[in-house]
A protein has these predicted regions:
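Glycine-rich phosphate/pyrophosphate-binding loop regions near the starts of catalytic domains
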Residues: 1-115
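Gly/Ser/Thr-rich beta-alpha loop segments that engage phosphate groups in nucleotides
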Residues: 14, 29, 69-70, 92, ...
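Low-complexity, flexible helical/coil segments
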Residues: 22-29, 66-71, 100-104, 122-125, ...
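Short amphipathic alpha-helical leader/targeting segments
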Residues: 37, 100, 120, 236-239
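Short, glycine/serine-rich, charged loops/turns that create anion-binding
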Residues: 37-38, 116, 230, 253
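Glycine-/charge-enriched secondary-structure boundary and capping motifs
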Residues: 46-61, 77-82, 131-142, 146-261
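Acidic, glycine-rich loop-and-beta core segments that form the ion-binding/anion-interacting portion
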Residues: 105-139
């Protein structure tokens, strides 16, 4: 879609965001990032836009871009196709690593707003939305992944957070259970946060069931935090200092898995 809409800078931010947000779920601070860009015939404009995005993503995350690899491989890639990859190294104090073991029933789930689709679910987007509609709304559909590093690391210094999940591929149903303690499940309350219209476009255009939407997309929640009920408003207030919108969207219950109702 980025190629079709000729919007490349956001891809670099997406690449960094997917890495640093994953590291953040452990309570770790990203230190440095490296990228890999491979293409059949080097396109200077495209490469510059992508690298600008990677640099911007690293700036937002507060980590260093220390190097990377640019490979021109004619004959291996179709005209215009390219590969983009990267990895990040972070650090955390061993005794402060967030592993979900302190999660227990009665705690609440705070959801932090996403910027939109982020980086997952685009196979379905391409399937259900018309190309002309995508191009018309490209800025909204291709809005880069939100990077949560600075607000969440600041929060961890102030408030108790027992688990963090980055809502990526697999949506709520796959990402939340793996950060919960044994014997704990999550109950998510639909309607407890505003769902961006881009998800309504997808659901209505493709006649997609609600459960499938929550299994595929972030539905407006890019990251969830588990904390004590009595601290939830403090958590939300602290995040608001970084202009992050957040809501109590559910609670931890006895059992397993995730229910969205």
């Amino acid at each position: 879609l980025a190629m079709y809409c000729e919007r490349y800078e956001g891809l670099g931010i997406d690449l960094v965001g997917m890495n640093v947000n994953d590291i953040l779920t452990l309570g770790a601070e990203p230190l440095f990032f490296l990228d890999y860009f491979a293409i059949g015939k080097l396109d200077h404009h495209r490469m510059v836009e992508i690298i600008k995005g990677i640099s911007e993503g690293c700036k937002q995350a507060g980590c260093a871009l220390i190097g990377g690899e640019t490979a021109e491989m004619p004959g291996l890639y179709a005209n215009g196709d390219f590969d983009l990859a990267g990895f990040c190294v972070g650090i955390a104090d061993r005794d402060k690593i967030i592993d979900g073991k302190k999660v227990k029933p009665g705690q609440v789930i705070v959801g932090i707003a996403s910027s939109g689709i982020h980086s997952n679910g685009f196979s379905l987007v391409r399937k259900v939305l018309r190309p002309d509609f995508i191009k018309q709304h490209a800025e909204e559909i291709l809005k880069p992944t939100k990077i949560y590093v600075k607000p969440v690391l600041s929060l961890l210094e102030k408030e108790p957070v027992y688990s963090i999940a980055h809502i990526t591929g697999g949506g709520f149903f796959d990402n939340i259970p793996r950060v919960l303690a044994d014997g704990c499940g999550a109950k998510i309350h639909m309607g407890s946060w505003p769902i961006p219209r881009v998800f309504r476009w997808i659901q209505e255009s493709g006649n997609v069931q609600a459960k499938e939407m929550y299994r595929t997309f972030n539905m407006g929640i890019g990251m969830i935090l588990v904390t004590e009920k009595k601290r939830a408003l403090k958590v939300i207030s602290h995040l608001s200092k970084f202009k992050e919108r957040a809501w109590v969207i559910g609670e931890i219950v006895k059992g397993e898995g995730v229910s969205v109702q």
